[in-house]
Amino acid sequence: MGTVLIHVCCAPDLLTTIFHVRDAEFFFYNPNIQPLSEYEKRREAVDKVANHFSLNVRYGEYSTEEIRKWYTAVKDYKDLGEGSKRCERCISFLLERTAQEARKRGHESFSTTLLASPRKNLPMIENIGKTIEEKYGVKFFFKNFRKGGAYQEGVRLSKELGIYRQNYCGCVFSLLERREKHAEISRKRGHM
């Protein structure tokens, strides 16, 4: 595997990932996470995990310009739901930036903690990673980080350590979808 730079989406998935790969440099880059208060909660949770396990975490830029670049990448697909082309474009955006950082810092490969999430499509992520690998000449390290009980152990540890566990993917579109879903459930309960 050599040296690897692993994109970090959130602390719960980081906890799951480190059961498989701990000797790595981690990269928290997420201009997709909104609002700012949510980004700050997630960054603080990653800090807590990094400090607890002595992990090497770098932080990518979170600015209006980076958010604008991310929005440009996904805006044509904003009305599509979770797991759609919108997510594919978002993941591609995040992994491309990770590959650029990996190449700049001399890493042999790059990966993502998204591979730990039970809500993500692993073949889609692998395809995106391989495409970016060809573009930047940095290998994409693919591994199902959920395996071997790691996901369940990550959940247990996050509760034990008091790590923030988010309830939506991160982007404003997934937040709105979640709110709409909960409003619909509430309406149905109100009519029973």
Swiss-Prot record:
For [4Fe-4S] cluster, which residues are the binding ones?
C9, C10, C87, C90
> What keywords are assigned to this protein?
4Fe-4S, Disulfide bond, Iron, Iron-sulfur, Metal-binding, Oxidoreductase, Queuosine biosynthesis, Redox-active center, tRNA processing
**Keyword Metal-binding part of the UniProt annotation:** yes
Give a single Pfam family match: QueH
**Is Oxidoreductase given among the entry's keywords?**
yes
Question: What is this enzyme's EC?
Answer: 1.17.99.6
Select a single GO molecular function from the record's annotations and give it.
4 iron, 4 sulfur cluster binding
Pathway noted in the entry: tRNA modification; tRNA-queuosine biosynthesis
Q: Name the domain of life this protein comes from.
A: Bacteria
* Cysteine disulfide links: C169-C171
What job does this protein perform?
A: Catalyzes the conversion of epoxyqueuosine (oQ) to queuosine (Q), which is a hypermodified base found in the wobble positions of tRNA(Asp), tRNA(Asn), tRNA(His) and tRNA(Tyr).
- Which family does the record assign? Belongs to the QueH family.
Q: What HAMAP family does the entry give?
A: QueH
**PANTHER family for the chain:** EPOXYQUEUOSINE REDUCTASE QUEH (PTHR36701:SF1)
This one is known as: Epoxyqueuosine reductase QueH
Q: Which organism is it from?
A: Thermotoga maritima (strain ATCC 43589 / DSM 3109 / JCM 10099 / NBRC 100826 / MSB8)
